[in-house]
Regions:
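Class I S-adenosyl-L-methionine
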Residues: 1-172
Length: 172
């Protein structure tokens, strides 16, 4: 969806499609007695909390307000996001790139960001703590809101990321 949003010239219809898709996910979850869970950003960092949508003829401040019973989640590189709705769970994405430490400090201080995701080079060598926070396994699913708060969510480098030297992967 993020690629479509960035490249579309017809944002209004894109948002209509997004609302329709969210309604379908919510209806399917209700029919199966499960919790609807939607990740909006795949490779982008769109500030969905600032984008109004229309559902059933009513304008809402954002998609989260339009669907209060849906749990949304995303990863973000923006450490100072504020006014995050309760049904939008954000995980800060760590980077070891030089100069990024200030963003990590901001993210740790920001209560809107529940945890920090870190990609480690080797699953077998994951530390029990990282940057002063306990480490939990995040590779078994992408359901981040179940990881808890004030933790490091450990993800493991796969494919080309195993050889990454940019600072994205923490070599352990």
């Amino acid at each position: 969806r993020d690629i479509q949003f960035d490249s579309t010239k017809d944002v209004e219809n894109f948002l209509k499609d997004l609302v329709y898709s969210a309604a379908m996910v919510a209806a399917q979850a209700e029919a199966t007695d499960t919790t609807p869970l939607i990740r909006l950003n795949g490779t982008s960092d769109i500030l969905w909390e600032k984008i109004p949508v229309i559902r059933k003829g009513k304008e809402y401040a954002n998609i989260f307000e339009a669907f209060p019973d849906v749990q949304f989640y995303d990863y973000t590189k923006i450490p100072n996001r504020k006014n995050i709705p309760d049904n939008y769970d954000l995980t800060f994405s760590y980077s070891g790139v030089e100069g990024y430490e200030k963003h990590i400090k901001k993210a740790k201080a920001n209560k809107a960001l529940k945890r920090i995701a870190v990609v480690f080079s080797h699953k077998e060598r994951i530390p029990a703590t990282f940057n002063g926070l306990p480490v939990v396994d995040g590779d078994d699913s992408d359901i981040r809101h179940k990881d808890g708060v004030n933790v490091i969510t450990a993800l493991y480098a796969k494919g080309k990321a195993k050889k990454d030297e940019s600072g994205f992967v923490v070599h352990v």
